[in-house]
Amino acid sequence: MTASDHIRPNGPRNSRELVLGRIRAALGDTAEVAEQPLPRDYLTAHVPADDPAALLDLLHHNLADYRALVHRCHEDELPRRIAGLLIERGSRTVVVPAGLPAAWLTAAEAEGVELLPDDGTLTAARLDAVDSVVTGCALAVAETGTIVLDAGPGQGRRLLSLVPDHHVCVVRTPEQVVASVPLALPRLDPVRPQTWISGPSATSDIELDRVEGVHGPRTLEVLLVTATGADAVTPA
């Protein structure tokens, strides 16, 4: 079998067909290679994975290093803290993904913030006119200061975390905090659409002039929430 066998007999021989045909032809002459086991004895984390307080501090530090605005609070303070962030931002409209706990936004709604539930029909243009979005997350990685969303309850479509200019994300600690990426992957469903967020959207030109908000939210605020009465909260 030659590359030409994979090209439409009556169609033009364009570069795409030519390249794919050559690849198929080359693979056809290659003997099947047995799958080899991968070594799994590598270091999976550079910090103790069993120290929740240390992981929380590391996550806080790395999130802030990426220029996210990080806040800590107890669970019973969460509605008030979310309302405070939205009011301080001047937000009058906020997108609410399906499955977000209703109690999180009761204080904001009482302050006159309009809640826009997302049923999947909000267009990018409509989302661009919204002031803020509030979401939960699937987990957060302490070593890299990364938050992972997987479109689960309270997280919404990927579009929600990319279009609004202000993203408030809630991370439940310690249960949603892992030490490293290798420890995060087994907890994630590989077939779900994942969005990995390390700080607000930013890019730099050739002279390293940083511009934020080009590919996503200009402002990322993260609330690290600990169960009421827990000791791992340092007010911020």
What are the residue ranges of the model-derived segments?
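The feature marks the mature, well-folded catalytic cores of soluble enzymes
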Residues: T2-A236
